[in-house]
Amino acid sequence: MRFSIFSSLLNARLNLLSKVIVNSSSLPLLNNFLFNIKDGVLIITASDSENSIVTRVELVNNDADFSFAVENKTILESLKTLQEQVLNFVIDENNVLKIEYANGHFNIPVITEHNYPTPKSVGDNAVTLTIAGELLYNNICRSLFAVANDDLRPIMNGICFNQTEDFMDIVASDGHVLVRNRLFSFKTATPDSFILPHKPALLLKTLLQKCKSEVVIRYDNYFGTLSFGDYTMTFRLIEGRYPNYNGVIPTNSPNVAEVNRKSLLGVVKRVLPFSSNSNLVKVELKPSEMKLNAEDFDFNMTASETLSCSYNGDTMNIGFKGVVFASMLNVLDVDSIYIKMSDAARAAIVSPTVQPEDEDCILLIMPMLVND
């Protein structure tokens, strides 16, 4: 049994698929990549039992259709320093894989008689959703930092895709911050929703980085599949109903600051090392200026910096958790932002001054107690 393939292509695909594998899996077979050669195409599968990624790679040549499983770390380490070339894979009667390259070879034991789990398939009643890969990537990147990690409320440990007759919301929240991306280009006659868990969302962030094609999402009550180009990902959904996120978004926030996002992010990063373990960063707002303060009296450290802004509203002191505030500013790829507040005890809304086309993106952050 023999096939040939370009080294850089195989190495790139294996590195992407390796991110789904959990080497502490209770099923040792899942520590392996599954290679399936069929009709001149190599189909590679990686899985952790709940999430699977399958990719298709064109071969230079092959002599038969066959499949085998190979340990992921061994083959990844063996290929990563090879220069671009055609690799020859040969499996002998003792189930030893020989990888031949320009100046040498590797011998790796493989499993040809295996019962590798088949990725789950969605039911016949699956809902289908098509979205541009770049749009999906941007919205996942904006949402991931707000996903919860809460064993008591697992429903919050993912990104909610909520489709309505007028728009689709992509939402994440951990109870302290909330991201709501509203896409007006998506409408449905039958409102529906699903919750994408954190791990497959993180995998998608990697897979979609260079995706210029459309992504097809299909899901039922338990599983979802996502397909684009040469990739298909299968994942288990989080079951349950996502909380009413719109109910926590303030409707009246008359105190509004407009500020350069990069400048504000730079100030937050500079003062943050001087804050206490609580990460509290105090923000003082006055007409035409914003002052950020951080202090750690236990170590006699303080920091203060002022930057210009446009502010309409009452003079206000409000506190934010600096690490979260910095993450929020970091995911917004815009020049300037609004920060809208009602008072120092209620949630503040952060949004771009110029929204992306056919989108409405808002980020919510709960304030911290400030002792004046």
Task: Spell out what each predicted region is.
Residues M1-D372:
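Structural preference for solvent-exposed beta-strand-turn elements
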